[in-house]
Amino acid sequence: MPKPAAGRIDETRPFQPVRIAVLTVSDTRSEADDKSGRTLVELIERDRHKVAARAIVKDDVRAIATKLREWIADPAVEVVISTGGTGVTGRDVTPEAFESLFEKKIDGFGELFRMLSWGKIGTSTMQSRAVGGVAGGTYLFALPGSPGACRDGWEDILRWQLDIRFRPCNLAELMPRLQEHLKK
């Protein structure tokens, strides 16, 4: 396993796979030619997590939000990672769909994604509206639609934050507490 830029894996802790749904947002892709979705699936499985579901939806706020709500309600899904629709064109509406459902936005995810992308694509990173947040006890992350962006988002951020062994802290260990405000 490669080393993260900062932090470390605590090998004394057992690995716990996370159940992840992969959503491709595209008007033109099918599963046969969905390179970005396939990239995410391969990376998730390589790192021993579970692909709980996979789907492709059109660039439409309602279609995206409907699929997200379905997965948020599904106890078999702990995390959703999407690819596509995060740019600035008229059809790019993934962030709007995600943010309409967020109970809490994870601002640092988009900020960190763009910071890391700066070293690879320079000022073009300003076109990315990658977002992350929490809804219904489920983590939601929206990545751009290129295989490279999916690889970067997974390799540089999510693989570490979804590994309960990552130190000094990680998002995986917070999953049991995401809905503690609902408990009395």
Which positions does each model-derived feature cover?
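Non-catalytic beta/alpha edge segments that cap or flank active sites
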Residues: M1-K184
